[in-house]
């Protein structure tokens, strides 16, 4: 999936920003979180997050649920490189495995457990 954030900001600017963030906040992970385009779930109010390295994927999902005011009975799925990451995984390990060449970790979310054409 194409990232709107990548489309709106040139690579050099993104890379410089991620490097600055990592230098200033070594214990935090720069994350870009965007909705899967064709999903009917609510759009998040901000894309950029600075998450603690020891946060789990499940805890991050909780943060996203709160930001989009998702009711408890509704499902949400997050994807990293089009794959559902393990809920218990630490954001730091997901970052090390999947960070983009610009230094950000790109996460997409959807109300459906499918990726691509819905």
Swiss-Prot record:
Keywords assigned by UniProt, alphabetized: Autophagy, Cytoplasmic vesicle, Lipid droplet, Lipoprotein, Membrane, Protein transport, Transport, Ubl conjugation pathway, Vacuole
Top-level taxon of origin: Eukaryota
Protein name: Autophagy-related protein 8
Gene this protein is translated from: atg8
Alphabetical list of InterPro entries matching this protein: Atg8-like (IPR004241), Ubiquitin-like_domsf (IPR029071)
Pfam families: ATG8
Lipid modification (Phosphatidylethanolamine amidated glycine), residues: 116
Compartment(s) where it occurs, according to its Swiss-Prot or TrEMBL record: Cytoplasmic vesicle, Autophagosome membrane; Vacuole membrane; Lipid droplet
Biological-process GO terms, alphabetical: asexual sporulation resulting in formation of a cellular spore; autophagy; protein secretion
Membrane topology: Lipid-anchor
Deletion phenotype: Impairs autophagy as well as the formation of aerial hyphae and conidia.
Keyword Lipoprotein attached: yes
Site annotation Cleavage: residues: 116-117
Family indicated by similarity: Belongs to the ATG8 family.
Residue ranges of the propeptide: 117-118
Biological classification of the source: Eukaryota, Fungi, Dikarya, Ascomycota, Pezizomycotina
Role, per record: Ubiquitin-like modifier involved in autophagosome formation. The atg8-PE conjugate mediates tethering between adjacent membranes and stimulates membrane hemifusion, leading to expansion of the autophagosomal membrane during autophagy. With atg4, mediates the delivery of the autophagosomes to the vacuole via the microtubule cytoskeleton.
Cellular component GO terms, alphabetical: autophagosome; autophagosome membrane; cytoplasm; cytoplasmic vesicle; fungal-type vacuole; lipid droplet; phagophore assembly site
Entry PTM: The C-terminal 2 residues are removed by atg4 to expose Gly-116 at the C-terminus. The c-terminal Gly is then amidated with phosphatidylethanolamine by an activating system similar to that for ubiquitin.
């Amino acid at each position: 999936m194409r990232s709107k954030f990548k489309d709106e900001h040139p690579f050099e600017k993104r890379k410089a920003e991620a490097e600055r963030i990592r230098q200033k906040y070594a214990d935090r992970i720069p994350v870009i979180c965007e909705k899967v385009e064709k999903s009917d779930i609510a759009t998040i109010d901000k894309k950029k997050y600075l998450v603690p390295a020891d946060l789990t994927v499940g805890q991050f999902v909780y943060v996203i649920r709160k930001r989009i005011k998702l009711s408890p009975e509704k499902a949400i799925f997050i994807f990293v490189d089009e794959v559902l990451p393990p809920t218990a995984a630490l954001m730091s390990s997901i970052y090390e495995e999947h960070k983009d060449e610009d230094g950000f970790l790109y996460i997409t979310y959807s109300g459906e457990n499918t990726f691509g054409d819905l």
